[in-house]
């Protein structure tokens, strides 16, 4: 297994259906509870564990998940409200070292709870036509609403797997 992609790379079907969207939304809907069950009782030493040498530690991963969902949610909303808006990339490495990432992981879990609730509420009301609406990412190009919902689900699961790998490692890194 490649620990960088423990659940594999994101794969989006060529033709995404409303059923696909609903499956991804079910994952997003339960994610905050599953993440909380995994990290809420961890001490500082455990939160400092990494899944591979040079990777973010568990604390940074939890904050990154919230930061990313926030950015992706905003992009999703822009794709639904504007005509092919261009969105900037965000420098996740710089976000990961900002002072707010020293807060307890519970702050990001609370943030995720609200963002994911909004994503799920919006997602269950998407129409077939809306799945093809898109935004233009300044680096990655055109991204459809359907692909963004897939990534919203995949990205969280991807990092939950990283956290579980870090916890199974015996060393601090």
UniProtKB/Swiss-Prot annotation:
Quaternary assembly: Homodimer.
Superkingdom of source: Bacteria
GO molecular function annotation: hydrolase activity; zinc ion binding
High-level lineage: Bacteria, Bacillati, Bacillota, Bacilli, Bacillales
Localization terms from the record: Cytoplasm
Name the UniProt record assigns to this protein: Putative metal-dependent hydrolase OB0413
One Gene Ontology CC term in the entry: cytoplasm
Textual note on the cofactor: Binds 1 zinc ion per subunit.
Disulfide bonds: none
Pfam family, one: DinB_2
EC category name: hydrolase
Cofactor(s) needed by this chain: Zn(2+)
Keywords tagged on the record: Cytoplasm, Hydrolase, Metal-binding, Zinc
Binding-site residues for Zn(2+), renumbered to this chain: 64, 155, 159
HAMAP family tied to this protein: YfiT_hydrol
Family: Belongs to the metal hydrolase YfiT family.
EC number(s) reported in the record: 3.-.-.-
């Amino acid at each position: 297994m490649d620990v960088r992609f423990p659940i594999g790379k994101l794969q989006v079907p060529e033709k995404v259906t409303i059923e696909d969207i609903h499956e991804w939304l079910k994952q997003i809907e339960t994610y905050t509870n599953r993440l909380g069950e995994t990290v809420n009782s961890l001490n500082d030493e455990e939160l400092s564990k990494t899944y591979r040498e040079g990777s973010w530690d568990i604390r940074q991963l939890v904050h990154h998940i919230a930061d990313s969902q926030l950015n992706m949610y905003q992009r999703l909303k822009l794709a639904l409200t504007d005509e092919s808006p261009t969105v900037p990339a965000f420098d996740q490495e710089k976000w990961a070292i900002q002072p707010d990432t020293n807060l307890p992981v519970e702050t990001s879990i609370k943030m995720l709870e609200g963002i994911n609730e909004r994503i799920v509420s919006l997602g269950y009301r998407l129409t077939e036509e809306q799945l093809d609406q898109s935004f233009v990412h300044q680096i990655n190009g055109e991204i459809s609403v359907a692909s963004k919902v897939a990534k919203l689900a995949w990205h969280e699961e991807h990092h939950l797997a990283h956290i579980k790998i870090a916890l199974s490692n015996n060393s601090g890194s």
